[in-house]
Amino acid sequence: MSHSVLPQLKPKDFASDQEVRWCPGCGDYAILKAIQKTLSELEVPRENSVFISGIGCSSRFPYYMATYGFHTIHGRAPAVATGTKLANPDLDVWVITGDGDGLSIGGNHLVHALRRNIDLNIILFNNEIYGLTKGQVSPTSKRGTLSPTTPRGSVANPLSQATMALGVGARFVARSVDINHAHLVEVRKQSHGYAGTSFVEMINKWI
């Protein structure tokens, strides 16, 4: 009895047919390419993968992946992802969020997802600003940042996601940067291999 062997998927096989609509030069492009390469090298089946996002520039992500996807409401991606994983334990569940979406209105959902430690891959894009709504300060904006909502400068100190994640009991916490493609891929591989909630902060530029 012969068994057919499926060809290994390439990074481009994880790209959907949708036009990528981020601003030219945005670091989100590099993160998208790195995750597509990661899934290819890990030989993750597309039909077993789902990307779940909230609202913001990073939250366009599910549209650009040739996998299952769910574009939810502001800040609720970790809650939807938790339900998805509990109902479908065999699914490879990824959460895509940003510093505004995940640390402001969605901060409570993120905290409890990290605390529960079920098998989720959480990626937080940190560009230190609300990019989609044209540059208001976010929870990670540096003190003194000038913006439409802080014309005299932000008075708050930036929130450290890594410190917060460790403080609520996260077991896998990492950080990478959009300009180091090899490191992006390696960090994603390691976090994917962790059998619990992994949290990776992706520092990326905003144009």
What do the predicted segments below correspond to?
Residues K10, D90, S138-G193:
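Conserved thiamine diphosphate
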Residues C57-G131, H183:
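Thiamine diphosphate
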Residues G27-A34, R46, G75, A79, ...:
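Conserved active-site and cofactor/substrate-binding residues in soluble primary-metabolism enzymes
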Residues N48-G54, V95-G98, L124, S176, ...:
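Beta-strand segments within the central parallel beta-sheet cores of soluble alpha/beta enzyme folds
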Residues M1-K10:
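Short, charged low-complexity linear segments at domain edges
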